Amino acid sequence: MKRICICGGGNLGHVVAGFLAANGCEVTLLTRHPERWSHTLHITTPEGTTLEGQLSTISSTASDVVPQADMLLLAQPGFAIRSVLSELRDVLRPGIPVGSIVSSTGFFFEAMSLLPSTTPLFGFQRVPFIARTEVYGHSAHLLGYKSSLNLAVERASRDDGNRIASEIQQLFHCPTHLLASHYEASLTNSNPLLHTSRLYDLWHNWQEGITYESIPEFYSNWTDNASSLLIAMDAEFMQLLDKLQVTPGAIPTILDYYESTDAPSLTHKLQSIAAFKGIMSPMEKVGTTYIPDFHSRYFTEDFPYGLAIIHRLIHEHNIPAPHIDQVYDWGMNLISRYSD
C-alpha cells in the first residue's frame, strides 16, 4: 500500500486526499486545522458516485505524518510553500519524493533552495482535478478530470523520473507524461494568466465607492475583451519560453489548449466548459451590494506567486511585455492597498 502525505487542506487537498484514500492508499494529512477534519472524507464525482476515503493520521505537526510517507504531495497556496518545506525537511526520509499539485506558484524554486539535493522533486503542469470543498474537513466535489497529466521531475535520474511519472499515473488513474524541465511546469499560462486577465477585465475601472448589484460568473460570463487580453499576455509569455529554450509545444498556447482560433471562439469555449459552470467571480458582500474580494486566492495567489514569477523572468530577459506589465502592476497595486 502506497503511503502518501498530503500537505494542505484546500479544495485540491480535500479531493486529492479523498480520491487517493478511496483508491487504496494510506493517506496522512498535514494541516493547520486538524480539529476540523473527519477521518472519513466523502468526494462526489462527475459520474454521480461518491468516493469514501479514510485518512489514517491528521496532524498539524510534520513529525506526526511525514516520516512514514513514501511520497509527499503539497496542496498549498504560494505564500505557504516555503514555511511548509522548512518544517518538513527536518523529518523527511532521504530520497523520498516531494511534489506539488500546483507548480506555478514557486514550488520548484523554493524546494531547490530548501530541500537536500538528494530529494527528488516533482510537480504537475496543470492540476489533476477541478475541485471544490463542500464541508471543510468532511466532503468535497471532484468536478472534472484531465484526460492526461504532464509532470516535471528534478533531482532524479531519467529512470527515477519515469518511475515517479508511472506512480503518478497509477495513483491518479490518468496517462502521465514526463516533461523536459521544471520550467514546463513552473511556468504556465493557466491560472497566472487566465485568472489575472479576467480579473483585470472585470475590475480595471474599479475604485473605492464603486459597488455591484450582483456577482458575475467567472467563466460563464467571460467576455471577448478578457479573451483578447489573455491572448496578448500569452503571446508575451511564449516569447519567454522561447528565450528559456523550453521545448516547443511543451506548454501549448492558450488558443491551442482551448482548441480556439481567436478571441470570440476562446470566449465561447471558456463559457461552455461544463466543469467551469457555477464558478463565481471573487467578491465580498458590503451591505446589500458587492465589491471585489482582494483576499481571494485569485488575487493573493495568482498575482504575487503566479504572475510575479513570469513578470520577474520576463524582465530578467529583457522581453517587452506591456500587457503582462499592465495587468501585474494593476493587481499588485490593489493587493498592496486592500489585502491586509
What are these regions (language model features)?
Residues 1-50:
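NAD(P)+-binding Rossmann beta1-loop-alpha1 motif at the extreme N-terminus of oxidoreductases
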Residues 2, 147-149:
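Nucleotide donor/acceptor-binding cores
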Residues 24, 55-56, 69, 95:
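Short, well-ordered alpha-helix to beta-strand connector turns
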Residues 54-68, 177:
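Short acidic low-complexity segments
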Residues 71-74, 78-140:
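Rossmann-like NAD(P)(H) cofactor-binding subdomain of soluble oxidoreductases
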Residues 134-143, 189-197:
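Short, surface-exposed amphipathic charged segments that create phosphate/polyanion-binding patches used
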Residues 150-256:
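Active-site-lining helix/loop region of Rossmann-like oxidoreductase modules
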Residues 211-214, 220, 227-340:
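NAD(P)-dependent Rossmann-like dehydrogenase/reductase catalytic/cofactor-binding core
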